[in-house]
Amino acid sequence: MAVRAQFENSNEVGVFSTLTNSYALVAVGASENFYSVFEAELQDVIPICRTTIAGTRIIGRLTAGNRKGLLVPTSTSDQELQHLRNSLPDDVRIQRIEERLSALGNVIVCNDHTALIHPDLERETEEIIADVLGVEVFRQTIADNVLVGSYMSLSNQGGLVHPKTSIQDQDELSSLLQVPLVAGSVNRGSNVIGGGMVVNDWMAVTGLDTTAPELSVIESVFRLGEGAAPGQINSSLKDTMVESFY
């Protein structure tokens, strides 16, 4: 399911929200309709936490996370950290990172298995990412841009990268990540993919300006049109498990 939304007249959905397979973060003060887009799809499935990070609402650019963990910058206040710990599932590890490049959402892109990071991140940061998120970490650029989190969106099913990414780069990244990649855009031609959308394994939210062709590319590369609601994934797995008992 891919849906379009706006955060207070902004199409940069990925700036004001973070979405994973086990939780969603939405900036506080979000106009109700923005929050309700997430609520409609996720309410009974995963917790949706309204929060600020370091007193700001650009939470999607300051945080990076997956099903297993959430990384926040060192400027995150104790109250915000406690609020996140109270709101997110107990098995999600939340870790503050002391890093010069503190807009973590711009410099890290990850799914539940792999992370691509800015080539200049500290070695210590790389180790924390691998440990907290439980992923394999690669230092990469996307179409010669070091801000991998800004120019790519990634789930366990696929990835969307900057429209000027060469075929050779796409193939290299695809083999690192072990998921299919497509070069494309969001919000009527914007190449800032990470800032313009959020995605998990069954849902994507993009800016209101995203065109129908862009939306169909998103639905196909992230395999969102395949009835992959979380409940259905579980039930199909359950069926195969039951069959294997006999």
Swiss-Prot record:
GO biological process: cytosolic ribosome assembly; ribosomal large subunit biogenesis; ribosomal subunit export from nucleus
Sorted UniProt keywords: Cytoplasm, Initiation factor, Nucleus, Phosphoprotein, Protein biosynthesis, Ribosome biogenesis
SMART domains: eIF6 (SM00654)
Kinase in keyword set: no
Cellular component terms (Gene Ontology): cytoplasm; nucleolus
Taxonomy, superkingdom: Eukaryota
Principal localisation: cytoplasm
Residues bearing the modification Phosphoserine: 174-175
Molecular function GO labels: ribosomal large subunit binding; translation initiation factor activity
UniProt modification remark: Phosphorylation at Ser-174 and Ser-175 promotes nuclear export.
A matching Pfam family: eIF-6
Localization per record: Cytoplasm; Nucleus, Nucleolus
Gene3D superfamilies: L-arginine/glycine Amidinotransferase, Chain A
Subunit structure, as described in the record: Monomer. Associates with the 60S ribosomal subunit.
Function: Binds to the 60S ribosomal subunit and prevents its association with the 40S ribosomal subunit to form the 80S initiation complex in the cytoplasm. Is also involved in ribosome biogenesis. Associates with pre-60S subunits in the nucleus and is involved in its nuclear export.
PANTHER family assigned: TRANSLATION INITIATION FACTOR 6
HAMAP family, per database record: eIF_6 (MF_00032)
NCBIfam families from the UniProt entry: eIF-6
Family in the record: Belongs to the eIF-6 family.
The protein, known as: Eukaryotic translation initiation factor 6
Gene assigned in the entry: TIF6
